[in-house]
Regions:
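Acidic (Asp/Glu) carboxylate-rich active-site/surface patches
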Residues: 35, 41-78, 83, 87-93
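Long, charged alpha-helical interface segments
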Residues: 10-27, 31-33, 41-47, 82-170
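Structured catalytic-domain cores with a bias toward divalent-metal coordination
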Residues: 5-13, 26, 65-72
């Protein structure tokens, strides 16, 4: 939707719009181009968690004890995205499972390359800038959103999607 707020919606694409004072104790109807499809494809899963760099450690701790974890990347318009793959690699590496499929191994390698930096948040930011999603946000004048999304562990919330109600609980 080209990073543009839809008519009739109170919030747009920017995570900076979703401040505590605006969303706390509110019911939010959210639609996305790609994320909604990815979440709906997971409805048969035992548990559906939503991850970002912002809640990285919380999600890693939540999945640590599970024997099998599927990390689903939403992508963009049916394409693999760098930002999704980087986060998937971070989650898979953080989980430290004894067996990984090839997709996980590729994502983990991307994450390991990114981690080779004194300033991990800055390195994540640089990776996100060169991704297609990052380029789209730059064209929309939303570089500050990329910077915000590149910050690790700014939140400890664990969003869970109920497969029955299709409501995300924080």
């Amino acid at each position: 939707r080209d990073c543009v707020r839809l008519d009739g919606f109170n919030f747009g694409n920017s995570p900076s719009e979703y401040t505590r004072d605006r969303v706390e104790n509110q019911t939010i109807a959210l639609t996305t181009t790609n994320g909604t499809r990815a979440l709906m494809a997971c409805l048969d899963a035992e548990q559906i968690l939503i991850a970002a760099f912002a809640n990285f450690t919380t999600v890693v701790n939540a999945i640590a004890g599970h024997a099998r974890v599927n990390i689903i990347c939403a992508g963009t318009n049916g394409e693999i995205t760098l930002e999704d793959t980087l986060l998937a690699g971070a989650l898979a590496a953080g989980r430290n499972a004894s067996q990984q499929n090839d997709q996980a191994l590729l994502a983990i390698e991307l994450w390991r390359q990114c981690k080779q930096s004194d300033d991990l948040n800055q390195n994540i930011f640089k990776k996100l800038l060169v991704s297609q999603g990052g380029k789209n946000l730059q064209q929309a004048g939303m570089v500050s959103d990329i910077k915000l999304c590149a910050q690790l562990n700014t939140h400890s919330i664990l969003p869970k999607l109920s497969s029955h109600s299709k409501i995300i609980q924080l």
